[in-house]
């Protein structure tokens, strides 16, 4: 049964023109089959409240879409009210406080572009089109996270609509339990964010990138080298390691990229060169000291991970202290084929810091993700099985998974510390007792009984 709504509120029912294109507004072209009961596209806070009331009146669950970048397609839930924030946009910077404010639909690239003229920076996502809603709520594995910390640590306040339609502001001193949850609860956050308030930091004056590529047979030497230099690697350098098929020579290779954040009179060489003295021999390509910018990196990333592809991803936090070289050897050497890749982003030393009191609570020295990237829908099952075969092989060495990469329907794992899980159940029960929001990573039956 359809429901009478204000005419200004864009609402698409299953038989409405444009329903399917709105439903499939996702980065991943492997769109889940679930059909929302209705898709609502609010333009202001009042309309978000109207959408919540619609869900209450019809006794439906609610899903929120910010940028649509979730590779697992969490925003699509059968028979739910999907609130798509694509037309709800706010982006502003206050130079007197150095605080930015943004709606969940604003992207990493848009926030970065806003701050660049002011010489300010937030460790935004590695993909420019990632919406800030999912990014901040899941913790925010942003640029140079290993040194600059988790993006959610930069939040100083959040405006939101509760599950019963009330407007609230939360911070460390106001509705503190919701503010705690907003920093790491991910898709289990029991409210709808309308605005993030974000502390900024001085931006780098310039950036340089150095890239080194070896045949994949050199993976042991390359991985050992990265592990060795991490404790002394300059804090303004982000290292990334990727194992993939390199176009051109069309061979399986292991690639190391260093993104260097520089002051006006600094050079990449003075920050990076000390770490290159023990670099393994045998590179097939080297690109040193290439001038770049965050904007340019986003353009490059669009080529590596384009919107017109199908994606399957799973990731792990490895237990600290394992023989990382031996455990990951087969992944680095055998997983790459076609456009698929192994992605390793070391988190030391931020992984050793005591985290603030927030829901984000699971981290380790080493984060690694497997990406299958392809076009043919007939490969969906094969690609998914292949990823899980590699993941199952390393399961004894796994601490848990980054919430943004969770695939609970495929693999059960840990996304938060045990004590945070207990606390998160309590916060969800307090603010969403009817369980309208969330149902992805926590047990929905237990949430309702907490």
From Swiss-Prot:
Any one Gene Ontology molecular-function term assigned to this protein's record: FAD binding
Co-factor requirement: FAD
UniProt keywords, alphabetically: FAD, Flavoprotein, Oxidoreductase
Domain called FAD-binding PCMH-type: residue spans: 32-203
Pfam family, any one: FAD_binding_4
InterPro entries, per the entry: FAD-bd_PCMH (IPR016166), FAD-bd_PCMH-like_sf (IPR036318), FAD-bd_PCMH_sub1 (IPR016167), FAD-bd_PCMH_sub2 (IPR016169), FAD-linked_Oxidoreductase (IPR050416), Oxid_FAD_bind_N (IPR006094)
Pathway where it operates: Secondary metabolite biosynthesis
Keyword Coiled coil: no
EC number(s) recorded for this UniProt protein: 1.1.1.-
Keyword Heme in record: no
Role played: FAD-linked oxidoreductase; part of the gene cluster that mediates the biosynthesis of the indole diterpenes penitrems. The geranylgeranyl diphosphate (GGPP) synthase penG catalyzes the first step in penitrem biosynthesis via conversion of farnesyl pyrophosphate and isopentyl pyrophosphate into geranylgeranyl pyrophosphate (GGPP). Condensation of indole-3-glycerol phosphate with GGPP by the prenyl transferase penC then forms 3-geranylgeranylindole (3-GGI).
Family membership: Belongs to the oxygen-dependent FAD-linked oxidoreductase family.
Record's protein name: FAD-linked oxidoreductase penO
């Amino acid at each position: 049964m359809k429901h009478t709504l204000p005419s200004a509120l864009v609402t698409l029912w299953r038989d409405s023109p444009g329903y399917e294109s709105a439903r499939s507004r996702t980065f991943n072209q492997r769109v889940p089959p679930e059909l929302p009961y209705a898709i609502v596209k609010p333009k202001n806070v009042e309309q978000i409240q109207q959408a919540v009331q619609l869900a209450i009146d019809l006794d439906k669950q609610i899903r929120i879409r910010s940028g649509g970048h979730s590779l697992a397609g969490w925003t699509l839930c059968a028979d739910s009210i999907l609130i798509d924030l694509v037309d709800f946009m706010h982006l502003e910077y206050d130079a007197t406080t150095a605080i930015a404010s943004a709606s969940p639909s604003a992207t990493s690239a848009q926030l970065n572009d806003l701050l660049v003229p002011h010489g300010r920076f937030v460790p935004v996502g590695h993909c420019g089109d990632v919406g800030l809603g999912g990014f901040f709520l899941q913790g925010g594995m942003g640029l140079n996270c290993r040194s600059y910390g988790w993006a959610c640590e930069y939040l100083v306040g959040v405006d939101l609509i509760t599950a019963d339609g009330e407007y609230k502001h939360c911070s460390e001193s106001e509705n503190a339990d919701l503010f705690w949850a907003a920093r790491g609860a991910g898709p289990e956050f029991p409210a709808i964010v309308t605005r993030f308030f974000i502390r900024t930091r001085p931006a780098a004056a310039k950036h340089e990138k150095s890239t080194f590529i070896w045949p994949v047979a050199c993976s042991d030497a390359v991985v050992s080298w990265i592990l060795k230099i991490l404790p002394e690697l300059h804090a303004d350098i982000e290292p990334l390691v990727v194992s993939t098929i390199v176009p051109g020579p069309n061979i399986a290779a292991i690639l190391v990229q260093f993104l260097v954040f520089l002051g006006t009179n600094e050079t990449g060489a003075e920050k990076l060169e000390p770490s290159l003295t023990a670099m393994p021999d045998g590179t097939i390509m080297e690109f040193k000291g290439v001038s770049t910018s965050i904007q340019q990196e986003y353009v490059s990333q669009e080529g590596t991970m384009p919107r017109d592809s199908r994606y399957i991803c799973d990731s792990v936090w490895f237990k600290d202290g394992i023989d990382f070289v031996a455990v990951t050897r087969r992944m680095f050497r055998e997983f790459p084929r076609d456009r698929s890749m192994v992605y390793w982003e070391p988190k030391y030393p931020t992984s050793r810091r005591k985290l603030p009191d927030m829901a984000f609570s699971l981290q380790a020295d080493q984060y690694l993700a497997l990406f299958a990237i392809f076009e043919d829908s007939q490969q969906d099952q094969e690609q998914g099985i292949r990823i899980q075969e590699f993941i199952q092989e390393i399961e004894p060495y796994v601490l848990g998974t980054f919430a943004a990469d969770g695939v609970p329907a495929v693999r059960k794992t840990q996304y938060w510390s045990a004590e945070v899980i207990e606390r998160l159940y309590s916060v969800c029960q307090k603010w969403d007792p009817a369980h309208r929001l969330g149902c992805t990573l926590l047990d929905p039956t237990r949430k309702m009984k907490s």
